[in-house]
Amino acid sequence: MVKIRLNRMGRRHQPFYRIVIVDSRNKRSGKYIESIGYYDPLNNSNQYKVDEDKALDWLLKGAQPTDTARRILRKMGVMKRYDEIKFQARKEKGVKESNEIVEPEGEEVKE
């Protein structure tokens, strides 16, 4: 399973995180597929930056964000766009299914 999670960087007592796409079986700071942003918790404004298009693309491919990554993506507005796209897809799928004509099974009744 592919995850969106934080990869710890920086020195001791001064953490800095990259937001990365990684196979869930890899180590916390192991090899990652792609880096899509960063998060600096020590900055007074909790500075973060995410490439929204890449994050949305990976979410649509099925990547699962961790809790902290999901919180950052929600602040950036990525999760809202993702939810809207998924809702629209479900809505269109429901319309297609309701437009199909279902013929009743069984024999016709003759009078």
From Swiss-Prot:
Gene Ontology MF, one: structural constituent of ribosome
Cellular component terms per the entry's GO annotation: cytoplasm; small ribosomal subunit
Protein's UniProt keywords contain Phosphoprotein: no
Pfam families: Ribosomal_S16
Residue ranges, annotated region (Disordered): 92-111
Superkingdom as given in the UniProt entry: Bacteria
GO process terms (BP): translation
Keywords: Ribonucleoprotein, Ribosomal protein
Biased composition (Acidic residues): 100-111
Keyword Cell inner membrane: no
Gene3D superfamilies reported in the protein's UniProt record: 3.30.1320.10
InterPro entries in alphabetical order: Ribosomal_bS16, Ribosomal_bS16_dom_sf
Family listed: Belongs to the bacterial ribosomal protein bS16 family.
Protein's UniProt name: Small ribosomal subunit protein bS16
